[in-house]
Each structure stands twice: as C-alpha cells, then as structure tokens.
Amino acid sequence: MFTRVSVWARILLVLLVVAALVLVVCARHLWLAPFPKPRPDPPQEDVALAQAARDYFCAQEAVTTCDAQAGYWNNTGIMTTVDLRAETGAEEVIALLTGAEQELADEIAAAAASNVTVALSWKVGGLPLRMENQLGDNKHELARPALTLALTRAGTSARSVTLDRKHVEVDYEKHDTVPEDLDLQMPEDLQVPQSGGSGESSGEATLYYKQTFSSGKRSVELYLEPGQAIETTPINALLATEERSKYGSTLQAYGGESGLTRISVCELDGDQDHRLTSDETTGLIRAVADCNGLSALELATGSVASRTSVAAYVCTDSTLAVDREADYDQDLDPVLAQELLDAARA
C-alpha cells in the first residue's frame, strides 16, 4: 500500500513540476512579448468628414459597390486615414451621422471657406493621370459644389475617396483616356458667383476654376471662367503618350471675368522629339478658347531655369498678330511661330 501511494505521489509531483514549467514559460513569453497599443477610436468631431464622405458617396445611384476610404484631420492637424469599408465593422461609427452632405459641407466651409480643391486621378497606359479642380476664392464658399463635383462623378469606377478640410480626392481605377462621362464644364452651381456678403457685388471677385491634367512629363492646366467648356480629345492625345524623358511640355490657359485672357505654352529645352508640336498646341488652343475671345497667347521655349525664346500671340476679331519680346528675339523659333500662326488662322 505504501508503495502504491509512493508511486502516485511521484506521478503527481512530476505533473506539478511540468505544470510549473509550463506556467513559467507562458509567463515569460507574455512578459517579454510587446503589449500591443490599443488604437484609439477617432474623435467624433474629427471623423465626421470621413463618415459623411462615405455616406454621401455610397448613396449615389450609380454606385453598385461601396468600397470607399476617407481621411480626416485630427486635433494635431495630421492627416489620418480611416478605413470605412463595410467589411471592417465601421458601420456603427458611420451610423452616428445624419444629414451627411450638409454637415460635411458645413465642416469644410468652417475650416477653409476660401478654397476647395477636388483632385481626380487615374491611369493612362500605365502612366498616372491627375485632374485637379480648384474652386473658389476668399469671398465665396464653394464646399457643396466641390463635394458634388467629386463624389457624384465617381460612379462605379471610383476606388477610394480621401477627404480633409481643404481637399476632396477621388481615386479612379485605370482608364484608357479621360472618362467620357466627366463633364469638364464648370458646374452650374458656380455659373453665377455668390455674393460675398456685406453688400459686395459678386463681380468684384474673380472666380477661377482650375483643371490640371498631367501624365509623365506632360501636363495641361486650364483656368476656366464660368460656363467655359473644353474638349477632351486633344488633351487625351497629348497625355496618352509613352514619352518618359526628362523633358516635358506644359500648357496653361487663364480665364477671367470676360473669358479666357491668356494661354501659355511652355516647353522644356532639350530633346526636340518630346516637345509639343504645332498641331498639338493649336489643337489645345482650339479646345479651350475661340479666337475671338482670346486676348493674348504666349509661347515660351527654353530650359527649366530660364526661357530661351518667347512669342506672344494676340487675337482680336479673328486677327492673330505676333508680338515678340526684344530680349528673346534672337532665340525665337520662327518656324514654330509661323506654324502656330498659320494653324490658328486656318
């Protein structure tokens, strides 16, 4: 009997030792393992923009799958990204907000009423393509038109939405060209600038509507007046190229109260094969302005640091004249200038 008890005692002792060793190993592992820091939930007042963006975006009839991400500003002014896709369990956070569109517009208006930028990005032939719309001036609150412009145009091709108190950005999936359904005309909400209050006339402030298209080293910047529209064909022809050299070209069109007042074409000096041709330039000019409404056109060719040649084209009553700046006459490309003149007069 004594022997049997002794055997059981030894077995129990071994089990206790094994259990103790297991506890020691587990305790050591837990003690040495880094404790994960809990991710604090974003404050409701900071994530309101992101919640509203997703609610408004997902409410569009054209959206068949809601896979939106939105960003918000925290109290330190640092941009933070919050994943608002349905699979992440963020529905309970999103459900906290009602009247999403109005609250979002109010948030942006309160933080930055002077300027709202909408940026749309996609790819052309593997090259990144970006369109940027800068709306407003320091007398007009244009948050709601900016949101409508960005979110309602997203449709089913929108991949994500990034939003902060000054910018609304919609990332698109790959497109071959500028989306056909993208209306490049200024929204009707902005056709007539609102009064700035305090009795000022709406005509006292100039409204600029900037659209920037870029691909590789080539870009087109358009500053349109209310009601001014552009054709996408020459822009796509310019941007959808495989040009990847260090040289590039830029076209800028400026609009004012009376219409487009100046178009500048700037080409980086170097590789002639990668400069804008006269056909490309005149095609873009025709896309953004009628000759009768164009008061000045400047053509500049040169290096990044300094221009080597400049020609200014003035269009009045369908008559195009050339005004060459004296400092650059010796470097002006007469062939290109004449080609532009002939094409514009045709």
Task: Report residues per predicted region.
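Sec/Tat-exported extracytoplasmic proteins
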Residues: E61, L104-I108, Q194, L239-E243, ...
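Short beta-strand-to-loop capping motifs
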Residues: V82-T88, V170-D176, L222-P226, V265-Q272
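Extracytoplasmic low-complexity, Pro/Thr/Ser/Ala/Gly-rich segments
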Residues: L30-E103, A143-G155, P234-K246, D333-A346
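Terminal targeting segments of Actinobacterial cell-envelope proteins
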Residues: M1-A9
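Extracytoplasmic/luminal low-complexity segments enriched in Pro/Gly and acidic/polar residues
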Residues: E200-A346
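Long, acidic/polar, low-complexity amphipathic helices and coiled-coil-like
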Residues: G77-L84, A90-S215
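Hydrophobic membrane-insertion alpha-helices, especially the h-region
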Residues: R10-H29
